[in-house]
Amino acid sequence: MTRVRRKGLAGIGLVLVGVLLTGAAQAAPAPGRAPAANTTAAAAAQVNFAPAPAWVDAQAVPLDAPVPAGGLSDGRHHLLADQQVRVAGGTQVDYRHNAVRAVNERGVEDIANVQLRFDPSYQTLTVHRIEVRRNGRVVSRVGPGALKLLQREASLESLIFDGRLTAHVALKDVRVGDVVETVHSVQGSNPVFGDKRFGSFDFDWGVPVASRHARLLWPEGRPLYWRLHNGARPATVTRAGGELDHRWRLRDVPSRVVDDNSPGWYDPYVWAEWGEFADWGAVARWAVPLYRLPEGPLPAVDAEVARIAAATSDPEQRLLAALRFVQREVRYLGIEMGANSHAPHAPSLVLERRFGDCKDKTLLSLALLRGLGIPARPALVHTGLRETTQQRLPTPWAFNHVLVQADLGGRRVWLDPTRAPQAGKGVAQWVQSDFGRALLVSPDTRELVPMAGPEARALKRELRTVLDASAGFDQPATLTVTTRAQGEAAELLRQALAT
């Protein structure tokens, strides 16, 4: 559910993360199409070969750029990272032009495999050029027949299926010193975002880049909001034809080295966010209809409500019983294709399938709590950004998780249905989720709200070691180690022992 900061150029180089695109389609005529190699013909129809759009300002590749003394990654020298985005009416196109030189054998291995990702349910990939240059001349050019479509499911190990495809090309006869140029665009809008557009531009990475060009064409008079991070300078803006042309040009961008052990909220990279959401309240209002419970009876849900209600009349015990049921009986599995990247599935379907992701489990929990008469609502959070979420531009990409905020007799409690089944006889014994700041999904929301205090985040573990040699130095001694965990530490230990 979130934009992931990357050390390399995976998001802007040879691999395009299509889920970050939020606009609608404006496709040029496509004289060539990729064949259906190992996917459906319908998906193959979403891949075109065509010239670049007329509005694109083509950038020259600095082929004479010297190889930096340090900072290269995997034998690659990134010569050009060009990204141009155009929003016009209800359409958006994201154009990329990247050029990478192989400086050694490892670099050849990497640049010879081109991967372009997109979601065929709402996006169209258009390949404009894929070429290999040697000594300044084009020695090979990729045609439609060379493209293979793969459904790799990159997040499979995390039990998430998103349905995105990878258009893959294995280039032939690539040598040390060759430059691979990839020019393509992606069109298409995830319907979950409605008519709102938002995105970002990166200006440095964990590798050096000889030339960086970023551009946003935006309709004049249409509201647009910016957030610049870590010293990013404002764009140079010109006006022409009813559009605002925002541009950045950077040369010889050095690499930025960041410790692998840095906390998840630490982001030293230079970048800019743009979008149409005026404030956090606007993001909350966007999410409200996604978590609106269906009217009328939900037989399977109502049956579970009746079971819990018959077992206890105490609101706190009802709350815990409902949450335990979702934690124990609904396993984690995310089917996040298309709009379901952010929209939950219906509670009845989740209960029938007995699996779901954080959105699905949250909506099912809300349905149970509604039936039990306990006020509750979803809360959007970011598990890594925590307090620094408030430094981001208000957009849906500021969040990557959702949980339940319930009102228990005036007490605000934060409960995560995706946790392993929790123990404890009351809320006081339960570990409440705390991710620093949360956005309550409600029409009345205006700002992010703080979650529990620092004491709730503390990992409490007591280790007691006793070496008993009282029987004498010539007798066996006894070593006893006792570990006592509390709070979050107890839940982590319990989960580890369960596996």
Task: Indicate residue ranges for each PLM-predicted region.
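Short, conserved phosphate-binding/catalytic loop or strand-edge motifs used
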Residues: 303, 338-348, 382-387
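Bacterial N-terminal signal peptides that target proteins for export
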Residues: 2-13
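Bacterial N-terminal signal peptides
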Residues: 11-23
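Short, solvent-exposed loop/turn segments at the edges of secondary structure
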Residues: 164, 175, 209, 241-243, ...
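Hydrophobic/aromatic-rich core segments of domains that either
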Residues: 324, 335, 359-453
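Second-shell loop/turn segments in exported
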Residues: 165-170, 305-312, 347-355, 390, ...
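Secretory-pathway-linked proteins and extracytosolic
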Residues: 40-58, 174, 187-198, 202-335, ...
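Lumenal/extracellular ectodomains and adaptor appendage modules
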Residues: 33, 38-213, 247, 300, ...
